[in-house]
A protein has these predicted regions:
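A charged, aromatic-enriched C-terminal amphipathic alpha-helix characteristic of glycosyltransferases
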Residues: 65, 357-389
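Membrane-proximal helix-turn-helix segments that form the acceptor-binding/catalytic region
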Residues: 147-172
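Acidic anion/phosphate-binding donor-loop and adjacent secondary structure
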Residues: 184-216
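Conserved donor-binding/catalytic core segment of Leloir-type glycosyltransferases
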Residues: 206-228, 232-240, 246
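Aromatic "clamp/platform" in nucleotide-sugar-dependent glycosyltransferases that forms part
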Residues: 301
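Conserved acidic donor-binding segment of nucleotide-sugar-dependent glycosyltransferases
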Residues: 334-343, 351-357
Length: 399
């Protein structure tokens, strides 16, 4: 049975690169895919082009779900009989030269492309973050709070360029929960929730030693350390010397300008804080880390869907998250922070570490179960198929 990548490679009929000075290939890459049989029309996808240029047997990158998403979105339209053109969301040179029935695009570059499409094209904005105004306000607020609390000023990596994708879209897709949805409700556009397709899954934590790991916690996230609350978590654990924090994320690469310098002592010279750096979620090392921890702590200030939290839940970790982390959590398997303060984080950490082994086991198993039931590639594909059916019905009405 062919993989998605192999299937798409079989049906690629034309691939060309446009080279421009100081422009990476994926900013101008173009892929044209044809279905088996007669085409029902054209679809334009503006998202991650890199996925379509993988070498034979090269795995889909697991550092973000968007690499698989791009392939699957194209594949769904192909299976339904459409011709699909794929460009990178950073492609600033592409001009639509044909009629498209449907346009799926991420927030970047959406407005420019939407203005160039035929009027009857149905335009879908794939929003993988909260609204940029909310996001940027939250990012600045966290940096301001850090300045007031510790006299440290850092630039946020998470500031997003303004965009008007929602204003030019007919439909909106999101990967998060009600929080993310609320930031777009002002538009009065139809909003469709897609479950995050976790990059990897893990076996049920049946052999986990909960007595041994009850005081070990994990912060796991991508760039934007202050935005995602790592500074708060670090300060909480400085006051909990008998509890341990493991940090997995691109600390040295982070562009929160000098986070690793400003927090060097805390990161690398504190007995109960263990900084790993970026971790491959498919590696035995990461599995060992999750097996040795009881919970993930993720007090993010704004997300489009907390993919790192979902990965941790798949590994059987109990989620301790902010509402803005945009992951549905209830008290049967996790805790939603109400204040995102150091004192609250300390209180919750002590509460979790003090629970009975059977309580911890039940919560961890439930987190794993919810992740397996909701956040899978199969469920993402099903939800996107349902969306396409709705768009097709809308297209028929518009004709």
């Amino acid at each position: 049975m062919h993989s998605v990548v192999a299937l798409i490679k079989q049906i690629i009929t034309k691939i060309f690169y446009l080279y421009h000075k100081n422009t990476a290939f994926d900013e101008v890459a173009f892929v044209n895919l044809k279905p088996n049989g007669e085409s029902k029309g054209n679809v334009l996808v503006s998202y991650i082009a890199e996925s379509f240029f993988l070498k034979e047997n090269e795995p889909i990158p697991n550092r973000h779900t968007q690499y698989w998403e791009s392939l699957e979105i194209a594949n769904i339209f192909l299976r339904r009989g459409y011709s699909v053109d794929v460009i990178s969301y950073r492609n600033l040179t592409f001009v639509p030269g044909k009629k498209y029935k449907i346009f799926i695009g991420s927030r970047t570059n959406f407005e420019r492309l939407a203005n160039s499409l035929n009027p009857d094209c149905i335009k879908v904005a794939h929003m993988d973050m909260s609204h940029w105004l909310f996001n940027n306000s939250a990012a600045i607020s966290r940096c301001h709070d850090l300045k007031e609390r510790k006299n440290i000023t850092l630039r946020s990596y998470r500031l997003q360029e303004e965009n008007w994708a929602v204003e030019y879209a007919d439909h909106i897709t999101i990967l998060g929960n009600k929080f993310t949805e609320e930031t777009y409700e002002y538009s009065k556009k139809p909003i469709h929730r897609l479950p995050i397709p976790s990059c990897t899954i893990y076996p049920k934590p049946e052999t986990k030693d909960f007595e041994k790991c009850r005081k070990n916690f994990l912060w796991f996230g991508s760039r934007g350390m202050v935005h995602k609350g790592l500074d708060l978590v670090i300060d909480a654990f400085l006051e909990l010397p008998d509890h341990h924090l493991t940090i997995c994320g691109p600390i040295e690469e982070d562009k929160d300008l000098k986070f690793s310098t400003k927090f060097y002592k805390e990161l690398y010279d504190t007995p109960n804080i263990h900084t790993i750096g970026w971790a491959d979620v498919d590696s035995p090392e990461f599995k060992n880390i999750t097996d040795s921890c009881i919970s993930i702590i993720y007090p993010s200030s704004a997300e489009g869907g907390g993919g790192c939290v979902i990965t941790a839940m798949h590994a059987g970790l109990i989620p301790i998250v902010s509402y803005e982390a945009s992951v549905d959590v209830d008290d049967s398997f996790g805790i939603v922070l109400r204040e995102n303060t150091i004192d609250e984080i300390k209180k919750i950490v002590v509460k979790i570490s003090g629970e009975r082994n059977d309580v911890l086991r039940n919560m961890a198993n439930e987190a794993w179960k919810i992740a397996r039931l909701k956040y899978t590639r199969k469920n993402y594909s099903k939800a996107f198929e349902n969306l396409v059916e709705k768009l097709e019905n809308e297209s028929k009405v518009l004709v």
